[in-house]
């Protein structure tokens, strides 16, 4: 007999070799599975995530699930037991017991990624692991105008890095927001879609920054999307500025879907 637990996890991805377990590497999945193994006195408990973040990518809202053997432990006790053993660069923020038909990956309705990019002339030592860096002038209004071209249903082949295993490249992009944080001299970019291809957000960020810098026309994204060719976009933003912000398991709220008829 097992009980299925759904947990929300925040982590500083700097010192992890990504989410997925890899022999000899420190990973998110491997760290949680090792703690569960200790809690079950040696039993293997498989952890499933909503997605596999790369090395250096952070999370505010990663969601995992696992089936815990033996007697059911109250959710409040489970999160306390796990957090008491986690390293300081990880913390569970929510826990609930769910039905067995819930799956952290296959039940997803949408994902929200946020990217922070510092516009400082030189790399800020206190930001270097938590923001991307773009030391060139950008016109945020141009980036905001360009971002509108991403909304809707598109084939995002041009923004998928090699190495991905998903053949269907069509995604519904519900929401894109580009904002200037003047106090911290950063550009904050938010993306909400039904899902994202391998490195898609980082490639989109790099392309929007090129538009902001005048290296591409404002509406060049339309051409790049239509081309369905990865060679149209050569740059990929650094992993350190990317955050998995939220995972939706109900329909994405209308306030994030604007007037899209999707």
UniProtKB/Swiss-Prot annotation:
Catalyzed reactions: uridine(38/39/40) in tRNA = pseudouridine(38/39/40) in tRNA
Its EC number(s): 5.4.99.12
InterPro entries: PsdUridine_synth_cat_dom_sf, PsdUridine_synth_TruA, PsdUridine_synth_TruA_a/b_dom, PsdUridine_synth_TruA_C, TruA/RsuA/RluB/E/F_N
Domain of life: Bacteria
GO MF annotations in UniProt: RNA binding; tRNA pseudouridine(38-40) synthase activity
Keyword NADP tagged: no
Residues the record marks as active site: 54
GO process terms (BP): tRNA pseudouridine synthesis
Binding site for substrate: 113
EC top class, as a word: isomerase
Keywords: Isomerase, tRNA processing
Stretch forming the signal peptide: none
Pfam families per record: PseudoU_synth_1 (PF01416)
Function per UniProt: Formation of pseudouridine at positions 38, 39 and 40 in the anticodon stem and loop of transfer RNAs.
Family: Belongs to the tRNA pseudouridine synthase TruA family.
Protein name as catalogued: tRNA pseudouridine synthase A
């Amino acid at each position: 007999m097992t009980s299925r637990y759904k947990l929300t996890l925040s982590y500083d991805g700097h010192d992890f070799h990504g989410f997925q377990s890899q022999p000899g590497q420190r990973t998110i999945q491997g760290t949680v599975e090792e703690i569960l193994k200790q809690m079950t006195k040696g039993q293997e408990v498989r952890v499933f995530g909503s997605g596999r973040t790369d090395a250096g990518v952070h999370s505010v809202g990663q969601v995992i699930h696992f089936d815990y053997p033996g007697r059911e432990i109250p959710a409040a006790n489970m999160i306390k037991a796990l957090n008491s053993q986690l390293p300081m660069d990880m913390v569970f923020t929510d826990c609930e017991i769910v039905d067995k038909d819930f799956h952290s990956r296959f039940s997803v309705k949408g994902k929200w990624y946020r990217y922070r990019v510092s516009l400082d002339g030189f790399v800020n030592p206190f930001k270097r692991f938590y923001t991307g860096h773009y030391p060139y002038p950008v016109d945020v209004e141009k980036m905001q105008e360009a971002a509108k071209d991403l909304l809707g249903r598109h084939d995002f082949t041009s923004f998928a890095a090699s190495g991905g295993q998903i053949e269907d490249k069509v995604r519904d992009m519900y929401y894109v927001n580009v904002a200037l944080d003047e106090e911290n001299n950063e550009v904050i970019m938010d993306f909400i879609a039904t899902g994202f291809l391998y490195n898609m957000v980082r490639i989109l960020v790099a392309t929007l920054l090129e538009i902001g810098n005048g290296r591409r026309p404002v509406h060049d994204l339309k051409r790049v999307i239509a081309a369905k060719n990865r060679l149209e976009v050569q740059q990929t933003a650094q992993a350190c500025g990317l955050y998995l912000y939220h995972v939706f398991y109900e329909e994405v709220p209308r306030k994030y879907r604007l007037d899209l008829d999707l």
